[in-house]
Amino acid sequence: MYNNTLLFLTLAFCMAASSCFDANQVSSRPQESAAIVKTMQSSFYQLQANSLEGKPVSLDQFKGKKIIVLNVASKCGYTPQYADWERFFQSHKDQAVVLGFPSNNFMGQEPGSAEEIAEFCQKNYGVSFPMFEKVDVKGEGISPVYKWLTDPAQNGWNKQEPSWNFCKYLINEKGELTHFFASKVTPESPEFKEAFSK
C-alpha cells in the first residue's frame, strides 16, 4: 500500500512539474532562419552516437527521412509515450525515423543500465526504433547530439533544451532542425501532425 501511494505521489509530482516546464509546447524555426542554415557550423549528419548495444552509429544513414529525436526515461509519467512513438515509427518507416536517447537528467527517472533499458522497452512497449546509449541532454556533460540540437551556432536557430523527459526535436529530410516539442506533445497532437506534414 505504501509503495503504491509513493508511486502515485511521485508520478503526480512529475506530471505537475513537467507541465510547469512545458509552458512553451512548440518552437519552430523562424522563416528568416532559412538563410542561417547555410552558415551552420556543422550538419546533423556529421554526428555519431553509440547504440544501446554500444556500437557507433553514424547519423548520416538517416539522410532523406524526417527524424524525431526523443529524450526518454523508464520511470516517468510520460513513459507510456514509448507506445505512441513505436506506432508512429511502424506506420511511417518509409519517410521517418524515431531516435530514442535515454537520459537520467530529470529526477533520476532513467537509472537503468543499457541492458535494463533495452529489456524494459522491448518487454513493455515492443520498441523497435533505434535506441542509443544513455546520455546527458543538458548541462556540462551534454552529448554531441543534444549540443547540436540546442546550440544556435550549430543548428541555425534553436537554443531550447529539453525541459523534461520525452521532449521532441523534428529534423527535416535535409538534416535541418525545424521544430521543438515539449513532453506533452504526441504523434497525434495537432501541432506535431501539422509540422510533420510540411
Language-model-derived ranges and their functions:
Residues M1-L7:
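Bacterial N-terminal signal peptides that target proteins for export
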Residues F8-A17:
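Bacterial N-terminal signal peptides
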Residues F21-D22:
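Bacterial signal peptide processing site
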Residues V26-D60, S143-P144:
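N-terminal "domain-start" segment that seeds a small globular fold
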Residues K65-I67, K75, T79-S103, Q122-Y125:
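Conserved helix-turn-beta segment immediately C-terminal to the redox Cys motif
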Residues Q95-S113, S128-G139:
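Thiol-based oxidoreductase modules, predominantly thioredoxin-like and allied folds used
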Residues E115-W164:
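Short, internal strand/loop/helix patches
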Residues P144-K147, P152-K198:
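Thiol-/selenol-based redox modules, centered on thioredoxin-like
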